Curated annotation (Swiss-Prot):
Subunit structure comment from the entry: Homodimer.
Keywords from the UniProt entry: Decarboxylase, Lyase, Pyrimidine biosynthesis
Enzyme Commission number(s) of this protein: 4.1.1.23
Active site (record annotation): 63
Protein name, as recorded: Orotidine 5'-phosphate decarboxylase
Similarity comment text for this entry: Belongs to the OMP decarboxylase family. Type 1 subfamily.
Disulfide cysteine pairs (residue numbers): none
Substrates-to-products reaction catalysed: orotidine 5'-phosphate + H(+) = UMP + CO2
Enzyme class: lyase
Organism for this UniProt entry: Rhizobium rhizogenes (strain K84 / ATCC BAA-868)
Residues spanning the signal sequence: none
Top-level taxon of origin: Bacteria
């Protein structure tokens, strides 16, 4: 895969007008886009369908978690939308239900391990007994056993996760920031080159591109850094 196949631009913008502006600015340079709650609930699901019809790949970041039947029903409908990736929290029963519902489709199911905005203090406050690294590895093992298509984790854990899941599963890393850029609300971050060298198959970059004065120039700089690390 080239850097263009690996870079996912997060459309973390408040409305369709902003999303359309970003996609237009990036043109053919970008293949993959991530759409999460913010845009999905502002007309973004139909926009996702349209982008997919235009040949773009869409990572639908819904982080599903519910009873088995509800998760399965949701996944069945998302398969019909033509999405390329879908996230759900890496809980064994939910993952197994999703895998069964997506069987035979091209949808890559991704297990979310620990949010990159969380550190050990946050996990303790939420009632977990594991530090982020340990919990990520445990959930990676569970995702592998469930038959998931990939894992979402920070670049800090990517190398260790890759050893668990092997070379074939997708390893998607958010919290990627070019050197010198603002971390924002992310706590466990790495540069694009570091993410690639750590074993990530795909990198998610949002603010450093969508908030840049020249999004295409920002994206091209990140693509060049990734290509150099491949």
């Amino acid at each position: 895969m080239t850097a263009r196949d690996r870079l996912i631009v997060g459309l973390d913008v408040p409305n369709l007008q902003e999303a359309e502006k970003v996609v237009s600015a990036l043109g053919d340079d970008i293949l993959y886009y991530k759409i999460g709650y913010q845009l999905a609930f502002a007309g973004g699901l139909e926009f996702a369908r349209d982008l997919a019809k235009d040949g773009k790949k869409i990572f639908l970041d819904m982080k599903l978690l519910d009873i088995d039947n509800t998760v399965a029903s949701g996944v069945e409908n998302i398969v019909k939308m033509g999405m390329s990736m879908l996230t759900l929290h890496a809980y064994p029963k939910a993952m197994k239900a999703a895998v069964a519902a997506a069987k035979g489709s091209d949808l890559c199911l991704l297990g979310v391990t620990v949010l990159t905005s969380m550190d050990e203090e946050d996990l303790i406050a939420a009632g977990y007994e594991y530090d982020p690294h340990t919990l990520v590895l445990r959930r990676a093992e569970q995702a592998l056993l469930a038959g998931m298509g990939g894992i979402v984790c920070s670049a800090e854990e990517a190398s260790a996760v890759r050893k668990i899941i092997g070379p074939d599963m997708a390893l998607v890393t958010p919290g990627i920031r070019p050197a010198g850029s603002d971390k924002g609300d992310q706590k466990r971050v790495m540069t694009p080159a570091e993410g690639i060298r750590a074993g990530s198959s795909h990198l998610v970059v949002a603010r450093p591109i969508v908030k840049a004065a020249d999004p295409r120039e920002a994206a091209r700089a990140i693509l060049a850094e990734m290509d150099a690390a491949l």
